[in-house]
Protein backbone atom coordinates (compact mmCIF):
# COMPACT_ATOMS: atom_id res chain seq x y z
CA UNK A 1 0.00 0.00 0.00
CA UNK A 2 1.17 3.52 -0.79
CA UNK A 3 0.39 6.40 1.61
CA UNK A 4 -1.32 9.33 -0.13
CA UNK A 5 -1.31 12.75 1.49
CA UNK A 6 -4.63 14.58 1.24
CA UNK A 7 -5.98 17.74 2.94
CA UNK A 8 -8.01 15.45 5.21
CA UNK A 9 -5.23 13.10 6.20
CA UNK A 10 -3.08 10.26 4.91
CA UNK A 11 -4.76 7.28 3.25
CA UNK A 12 -3.42 4.20 1.51
CA UNK A 13 -3.83 3.23 -2.13
CA UNK A 14 -3.32 -0.27 -3.47
CA UNK A 15 -0.89 -1.14 -6.26
CA UNK A 16 0.47 -4.44 -7.53
CA UNK A 17 3.53 -5.01 -9.68
CA UNK A 18 3.68 -7.71 -12.36
CA UNK A 19 7.06 -8.47 -13.93
CA UNK A 20 10.47 -6.88 -13.63
CA UNK A 21 12.02 -4.66 -16.29
CA UNK A 22 14.10 -1.62 -15.25
CA UNK A 23 13.60 -0.03 -18.70
CA UNK A 24 9.85 -0.48 -19.20
CA UNK A 25 7.38 0.15 -16.38
CA UNK A 26 3.71 0.74 -17.25
CA UNK A 27 1.26 2.21 -14.74
CA UNK A 28 -2.34 1.32 -15.65
CA UNK A 29 -5.10 3.88 -14.97
CA UNK A 30 -8.61 2.42 -14.98
CA UNK A 31 -11.72 4.13 -16.30
CA UNK A 32 -15.05 5.00 -14.81
CA UNK A 33 -14.54 7.31 -13.09
CA UNK A 34 -14.67 4.99 -10.13
CA UNK A 35 -13.80 1.64 -11.67
CA UNK A 36 -11.20 -0.59 -10.00
CA UNK A 37 -8.25 -2.15 -11.79
CA UNK A 38 -9.91 -5.56 -12.16
CA UNK A 39 -10.94 -5.36 -15.82
CA UNK A 40 -7.37 -4.45 -16.79
CA UNK A 41 -6.31 -7.98 -15.87
CA UNK A 42 -6.54 -8.61 -19.62
CA UNK A 43 -2.98 -7.27 -19.82
CA UNK A 44 -1.69 -10.28 -17.88
CA UNK A 45 -2.13 -12.42 -20.99
CA UNK A 46 0.22 -10.20 -23.01
CA UNK A 47 2.64 -7.98 -21.09
CA UNK A 48 4.51 -10.63 -19.05
CA UNK A 49 5.38 -12.62 -22.16
CA UNK A 50 6.90 -9.49 -23.70
CA UNK A 51 8.98 -8.69 -20.61
CA UNK A 52 6.94 -5.58 -19.82
CA UNK A 53 6.71 -4.63 -16.15
CA UNK A 54 3.36 -3.13 -15.22
CA UNK A 55 1.42 -1.93 -12.21
CA UNK A 56 -2.21 -2.20 -11.25
CA UNK A 57 -3.49 0.77 -9.26
CA UNK A 58 -6.81 1.55 -7.61
CA UNK A 59 -7.47 5.25 -7.09
CA UNK A 60 -8.29 6.35 -3.55
CA UNK A 61 -11.88 5.35 -2.90
CA UNK A 62 -11.82 2.56 -5.48
CA UNK A 63 -11.27 -1.18 -5.36
CA UNK A 64 -8.67 -2.32 -2.83
CA UNK A 65 -7.64 1.20 -1.77
CA UNK A 66 -8.82 3.08 1.30
CA UNK A 67 -12.27 4.60 1.05
CA UNK A 68 -12.21 7.85 3.02
CA UNK A 69 -15.55 8.94 1.57
CA UNK A 70 -14.11 12.35 0.73
CA UNK A 71 -16.14 13.58 -2.24
CA UNK A 72 -14.09 16.79 -2.35
CA UNK A 73 -11.35 14.71 -4.01
CA UNK A 74 -13.58 13.65 -6.90
CA UNK A 75 -11.98 16.01 -9.42
CA UNK A 76 -9.25 16.03 -12.05
CA UNK A 77 -6.66 18.00 -10.05
CA UNK A 78 -6.79 15.69 -7.04
CA UNK A 79 -6.57 12.61 -9.25
CA UNK A 80 -3.50 13.99 -11.07
CA UNK A 81 -1.82 14.80 -7.75
CA UNK A 82 -2.51 11.27 -6.55
CA UNK A 83 -0.91 9.72 -9.65
CA UNK A 84 2.20 11.80 -9.04
CA UNK A 85 2.40 10.59 -5.44
CA UNK A 86 2.08 7.00 -6.69
CA UNK A 87 4.82 7.59 -9.28
CA UNK A 88 7.17 8.89 -6.62
CA UNK A 89 6.49 5.93 -4.33
CA UNK A 90 7.08 3.44 -7.15
CA UNK A 91 10.25 5.32 -8.18
CA UNK A 92 9.22 5.60 -11.82
CA UNK A 93 10.97 8.24 -13.95
CA UNK A 94 11.46 9.53 -17.47
CA UNK A 95 13.81 6.66 -18.31
CA UNK A 96 11.15 3.99 -17.83
CA UNK A 97 7.69 5.39 -16.98
CA UNK A 98 4.94 4.58 -19.48
CA UNK A 99 1.50 5.83 -18.42
CA UNK A 100 -1.55 3.98 -19.78
CA UNK A 101 -5.05 5.31 -19.26
CA UNK A 102 -8.35 3.85 -20.44
CA UNK A 103 -11.44 6.06 -20.78
CA UNK A 104 -11.46 8.31 -17.67
CA UNK A 105 -7.94 6.99 -17.07
CA UNK A 106 -7.04 8.42 -20.48
CA UNK A 107 -8.29 11.87 -19.45
CA UNK A 108 -6.27 11.57 -16.27
CA UNK A 109 -3.23 10.42 -18.25
CA UNK A 110 -3.37 13.40 -20.59
CA UNK A 111 -3.71 15.84 -17.70
CA UNK A 112 -0.78 14.18 -15.94
CA UNK A 113 1.34 14.23 -19.10
CA UNK A 114 0.92 17.99 -19.44
CA UNK A 115 1.67 18.80 -15.80
CA UNK A 116 4.39 16.24 -15.09
CA UNK A 117 5.84 15.17 -18.42
CA UNK A 118 9.41 15.59 -17.24
CA UNK A 119 8.72 12.43 -15.22
CA UNK A 120 7.28 10.53 -18.17
CA UNK A 121 8.70 8.47 -21.03
CA UNK A 122 5.52 7.85 -23.03
CA UNK A 123 1.73 8.06 -22.83
CA UNK A 124 -0.98 5.66 -24.02
CA UNK A 125 -4.54 7.03 -24.20
CA UNK A 126 -7.12 4.34 -24.84
CA UNK A 127 -10.68 5.09 -25.92
CA UNK A 128 -10.97 8.65 -24.64
CA UNK A 129 -11.91 11.91 -26.34
CA UNK A 130 -10.60 15.37 -25.46
CA UNK A 131 -13.71 16.91 -23.89
CA UNK A 132 -17.03 16.20 -22.24
CA UNK A 133 -18.71 18.23 -24.96
CA UNK A 134 -17.27 15.97 -27.66
CA UNK A 135 -18.39 12.86 -25.79
CA UNK A 136 -21.95 14.18 -25.54
CA UNK A 137 -22.03 15.24 -29.20
CA UNK A 138 -21.12 11.79 -30.48
CA UNK A 139 -23.42 9.91 -28.13
CA UNK A 140 -26.44 12.10 -28.89
CA UNK A 141 -25.89 12.72 -32.61
CA UNK A 142 -24.59 9.31 -33.64
CA UNK A 143 -24.91 6.49 -31.12
CA UNK A 144 -28.40 6.82 -29.64
CA UNK A 145 -29.82 6.99 -33.17
CA UNK A 146 -28.63 3.41 -33.63
CA UNK A 147 -30.87 2.18 -30.81
CA UNK A 148 -34.36 0.82 -31.59
CA UNK A 149 -36.78 3.78 -31.41
CA UNK A 150 -39.07 2.15 -28.85
CA UNK A 151 -36.11 1.31 -26.61
CA UNK A 152 -34.75 4.84 -26.88
CA UNK A 153 -38.16 6.30 -26.05
CA UNK A 154 -38.32 4.24 -22.86
CA UNK A 155 -34.76 5.18 -21.88
CA UNK A 156 -35.46 8.87 -22.51
CA UNK A 157 -38.71 8.69 -20.54
CA UNK A 158 -36.96 7.16 -17.54
CA UNK A 159 -34.16 9.73 -17.83
CA UNK A 160 -36.64 12.61 -17.97
CA UNK A 161 -38.16 11.34 -14.73
CA UNK A 162 -34.69 10.98 -13.21
CA UNK A 163 -35.57 7.32 -12.64
CA UNK A 164 -32.07 5.97 -13.20
CA UNK A 165 -32.37 3.47 -10.34
CA UNK A 166 -35.24 1.72 -12.10
CA UNK A 167 -34.10 -1.83 -12.97
CA UNK A 168 -35.68 -1.37 -16.39
CA UNK A 169 -33.29 1.49 -17.12
CA UNK A 170 -30.13 -0.48 -16.34
CA UNK A 171 -31.47 -3.50 -18.21
CA UNK A 172 -32.18 -1.53 -21.39
CA UNK A 173 -28.93 0.45 -21.29
CA UNK A 174 -26.90 -2.72 -20.72
CA UNK A 175 -28.64 -4.77 -23.40
CA UNK A 176 -28.86 -2.08 -26.08
CA UNK A 177 -26.04 0.41 -25.38
CA UNK A 178 -23.35 -1.44 -23.47
CA UNK A 179 -23.64 -4.53 -25.68
CA UNK A 180 -23.19 -2.35 -28.78
CA UNK A 181 -20.61 0.20 -27.70
CA UNK A 182 -18.94 -0.85 -24.42
CA UNK A 183 -18.11 -4.53 -25.03
CA UNK A 184 -19.34 -6.39 -28.11
CA UNK A 185 -18.89 -9.85 -26.65
CA UNK A 186 -22.25 -11.51 -25.88
CA UNK A 187 -23.37 -10.33 -22.46
CA UNK A 188 -23.33 -13.86 -21.06
CA UNK A 189 -19.70 -14.17 -22.22
CA UNK A 190 -18.35 -11.00 -20.65
CA UNK A 191 -15.06 -11.87 -18.91
CA UNK A 192 -15.16 -12.38 -15.16
CA UNK A 193 -12.69 -9.51 -14.43
CA UNK A 194 -14.98 -7.12 -16.32
CA UNK A 195 -18.10 -8.20 -14.45
CA UNK A 196 -16.14 -8.00 -11.21
CA UNK A 197 -15.11 -4.41 -11.99
CA UNK A 198 -18.73 -3.41 -12.66
CA UNK A 199 -19.78 -4.93 -9.33
CA UNK A 200 -17.18 -2.88 -7.42
CA UNK A 201 -17.59 0.56 -9.02
CA UNK A 202 -17.28 3.59 -6.72
CA UNK A 203 -20.71 4.99 -7.54
CA UNK A 204 -20.36 8.42 -5.84
CA UNK A 205 -17.17 9.09 -7.85
CA UNK A 206 -18.90 8.08 -11.09
CA UNK A 207 -21.98 10.16 -10.34
CA UNK A 208 -19.93 13.26 -9.46
CA UNK A 209 -17.86 13.34 -12.64
CA UNK A 210 -19.96 11.44 -15.19
CA UNK A 211 -23.51 11.56 -13.91
CA UNK A 212 -26.03 8.72 -13.69
CA UNK A 213 -25.69 7.41 -17.25
CA UNK A 214 -23.27 6.59 -20.07
CA UNK A 215 -25.73 8.17 -22.50
CA UNK A 216 -24.35 11.62 -21.76
CA UNK A 217 -22.16 13.40 -19.25
CA UNK A 218 -24.05 15.69 -16.88
CA UNK A 219 -21.48 15.57 -14.07
CA UNK A 220 -18.47 17.85 -13.68
CA UNK A 221 -16.67 16.33 -16.69
CA UNK A 222 -19.19 17.95 -19.04
CA UNK A 223 -17.08 21.14 -18.89
CA UNK A 224 -13.71 19.35 -19.02
CA UNK A 225 -11.79 20.14 -22.22
CA UNK A 226 -8.14 19.44 -22.96
CA UNK A 227 -8.37 19.96 -26.74
CA UNK A 228 -6.36 23.17 -26.92
CA UNK A 229 -3.64 21.78 -24.66
CA UNK A 230 -2.93 18.54 -26.51
CA UNK A 231 -0.05 20.20 -28.34
CA UNK A 232 1.70 20.56 -24.97
CA UNK A 233 2.16 16.78 -24.67
CA UNK A 234 5.79 16.43 -25.72
CA UNK A 235 6.39 12.73 -25.00
CA UNK A 236 5.57 9.98 -27.53
CA UNK A 237 1.86 9.25 -27.26
CA UNK A 238 -0.37 6.51 -28.63
CA UNK A 239 -4.10 7.20 -29.00
CA UNK A 240 -6.46 4.26 -29.46
CA UNK A 241 -9.89 4.44 -31.06
CA UNK A 242 -12.40 1.81 -32.15
CA UNK A 243 -15.08 1.45 -34.79
CA UNK A 244 -17.86 0.63 -32.34
CA UNK A 245 -16.68 2.71 -29.38
CA UNK A 246 -18.88 5.16 -27.50
CA UNK A 247 -16.07 7.64 -28.23
CA UNK A 248 -15.69 8.99 -31.79
CA UNK A 249 -12.62 7.31 -33.37
CA UNK A 250 -12.24 10.14 -35.88
CA UNK A 251 -11.94 12.62 -33.04
CA UNK A 252 -9.38 10.40 -31.32
CA UNK A 253 -7.42 10.25 -34.58
CA UNK A 254 -7.52 14.07 -34.67
CA UNK A 255 -6.18 14.12 -31.11
CA UNK A 256 -3.18 12.03 -32.17
CA UNK A 257 -2.44 14.61 -34.86
CA UNK A 258 -2.37 17.47 -32.35
CA UNK A 259 0.42 15.86 -30.34
CA UNK A 260 3.94 16.40 -31.75
CA UNK A 261 4.86 12.72 -31.38
CA UNK A 262 1.40 11.20 -31.58
CA UNK A 263 0.35 7.91 -33.14
CA UNK A 264 -3.10 6.44 -33.75
CA UNK A 265 -4.21 2.82 -33.38
CA UNK A 266 -7.59 2.01 -34.90
CA UNK A 267 -9.46 -1.10 -33.78
CA UNK A 268 -12.01 -1.38 -36.58
CA UNK A 269 -13.99 -4.20 -34.99
CA UNK A 270 -13.59 -3.14 -31.36
CA UNK A 271 -15.68 -1.12 -28.95
CA UNK A 272 -14.93 0.87 -25.80
CA UNK A 273 -13.35 -2.29 -24.42
CA UNK A 274 -11.29 -3.26 -27.45
CA UNK A 275 -8.94 -4.87 -24.95
CA UNK A 276 -11.56 -7.64 -24.88
CA UNK A 277 -13.50 -7.61 -28.15
CA UNK A 278 -10.50 -7.03 -30.46
CA UNK A 279 -7.89 -8.16 -27.99
CA UNK A 280 -4.91 -9.46 -30.04
CA UNK A 281 -4.85 -6.44 -32.36
CA UNK A 282 -5.27 -4.01 -29.46
CA UNK A 283 -2.61 -5.56 -27.25
CA UNK A 284 -0.11 -6.07 -30.04
CA UNK A 285 -0.51 -2.44 -31.09
CA UNK A 286 0.32 -1.25 -27.58
CA UNK A 287 3.27 -3.64 -27.29
CA UNK A 288 4.61 -2.47 -30.66
CA UNK A 289 4.41 1.17 -29.54
CA UNK A 290 6.19 0.46 -26.25
CA UNK A 291 8.96 -1.39 -28.05
CA UNK A 292 9.35 1.41 -30.60
CA UNK A 293 9.76 4.00 -27.87
CA UNK A 294 12.13 1.81 -25.89
CA UNK A 295 14.26 0.99 -28.93
CA UNK A 296 14.45 4.60 -30.12
CA UNK A 297 15.65 5.77 -26.71
CA UNK A 298 18.28 3.03 -26.65
CA UNK A 299 19.83 4.21 -29.92
Curated annotation (Swiss-Prot):
Subunit structure: Monomer.
Keyword Transcription carried by entry: no
Keywords: Aminopeptidase, Hydrolase, Protease
SUPFAM superfamilies: alpha/beta-Hydrolases
Molecular function in Gene Ontology: aminopeptidase activity
Any Pfam family the entry gives: Abhydrolase_1
GO biological process per UniProt: proteolysis
Keyword Protein biosynthesis belongs to the record: no
Disulfide bond annotation, renumbered to this chain: none
Organism annotation: Chitinophaga pinensis (strain ATCC 43595 / DSM 2588 / LMG 13176 / NBRC 15968 / NCIMB 11800 / UQM 2034)
Functional summary from the UniProt entry: Releases the N-terminal proline from various substrates.
Protein name: Proline iminopeptidase
Catalytic activity: Release of N-terminal proline from a peptide
Phylogenetic lineage: Bacteria, Pseudomonadati, Bacteroidota, Chitinophagia, Chitinophagales
EC numbers: 3.4.11.5
Residue ranges of the TM segments: none
InterPro entries per the UniProt record, alphabetical: AB_hydrolase_1, AB_hydrolase_fold, AB_hydrolase_sf, Peptidase_S33, Pro_imino_pep
Amino acid sequence: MIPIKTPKGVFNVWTKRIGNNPKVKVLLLAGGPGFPHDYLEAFESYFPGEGIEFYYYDELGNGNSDKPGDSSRYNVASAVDEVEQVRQALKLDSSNFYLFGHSWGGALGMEYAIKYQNNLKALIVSNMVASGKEFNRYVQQVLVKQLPPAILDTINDLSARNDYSNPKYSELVTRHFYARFICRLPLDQWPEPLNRAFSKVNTPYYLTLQGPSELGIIGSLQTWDISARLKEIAVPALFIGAGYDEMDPEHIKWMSQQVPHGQFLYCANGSHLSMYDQQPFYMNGIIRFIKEVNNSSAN
